[in-house]
């Protein structure tokens, strides 16, 4: 048209140039395409398919049981420290603050460890920490004057607080892939609430008298549950239908990063 002709005639230097911001739009489009391509390569099982595998139900049960240690100490640490350990209200309040910090540290530590040492070692290490924490709590009742043992007990038992919530996000992609991660982890929410229901019913009558003997029995039961949860989770993870593909893709990504760093 005449208008288009005049624009070209008056601004010949702009013919063939791209609009302002075009390069940024190209970068965004390339990033989106790369993300979609990566997701398609990662793949994974949808929820309906995952539920048909033994791995799904093993991990469901493992996560449910692994919630017991954290729930037990959150619910009964007050009765424990003010009962058999003999802390007064003010001293206990100070230690409760330390316990909360340890819970947060435990969540951060689990995230770092999963990236550095892998899911299998993380599961083993965190459950060993849980078992060690409750073992220290049992010994502490025979050595109530030991500040060092009290500190170690609070740190270890605090770190096992997020055992189930912080473990699931790393186990699920490895077992079932990342593609349907959101819907699969949502289906595990019920498992991670089992401890809130079962632990009070299980331990309430045992520690009703608040004695060292009753707490010792309760903590021994929790140690047993922690060991069982670790084994079940590892079996479920090793039987994960997508684990081989996940590890192969992760190794490929690691190799690409190394190659990029060398360049």
What are these regions (language model features)?
Residues 1-33, 230-238:
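C-terminal membrane-cytosol helix-exit motif in multi-pass small-molecule transporters
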Residues 97-171:
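C-terminal transmembrane helical hairpin of 12-TM major facilitator-type secondary transporters
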Residues 2-8, 223-256:
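Multi-pass alpha-helical transporter architecture, strongest
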Residues 87-96, 146, 150, 181, ...:
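Juxtamembrane helix-start elements in MFS-like secondary transporters
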């Amino acid at each position: 048209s005449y208008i288009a002709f005049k624009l070209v005639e008056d601004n010949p230097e702009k013919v063939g140039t791209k609009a302002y911001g075009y390069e940024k739009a190209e970068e965004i489009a390339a990033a989106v395409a790369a993300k979609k391509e990566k997701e398609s390569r990662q793949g994974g099982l949808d929820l309906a398919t995952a539920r048909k595998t033994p791995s799904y139900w093993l991990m469901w049960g493992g996560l449910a049981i692994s919630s017991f240690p954290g729930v037990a100490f959150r619910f009964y640490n007050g009765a424990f420290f003010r009962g058999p350990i003999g802390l007064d209200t003010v001293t206990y309040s100070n230690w409760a603050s330390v316990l909360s910090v340890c819970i947060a540290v435990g969540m951060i530590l689990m995230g770092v460890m999963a990236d550095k040492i892998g899911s299998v070692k993380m599961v083993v290490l965190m459950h060993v920490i849980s078992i060690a924490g409750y073992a220290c709590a049992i010994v502490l009742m025979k050595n109530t004057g030991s500040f060092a043992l009290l500190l170690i007990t609070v740190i270890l038992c605090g770190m096992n607080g997020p055992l189930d919530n912080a473990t699931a996000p790393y186990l699920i992609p490895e077992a079932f892939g990342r593609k349907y991660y959101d819907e699969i982890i949502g289906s595990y929410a019920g498992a991670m609430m089992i401890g809130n229901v079962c632990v009070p019913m299980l331990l309430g009558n045992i520690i009703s008298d608040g004695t060292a003997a009753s707490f010792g029995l309760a903590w021994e039961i929790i140690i047993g549950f922690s060991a069982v949860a670790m084994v079940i989770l590892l079996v479920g993870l090793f039987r994960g239908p997508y684990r081989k593909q996940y590890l192969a893709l992760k190794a490929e990504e690691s190799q690409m990063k190394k190659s990029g760093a060398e360049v």
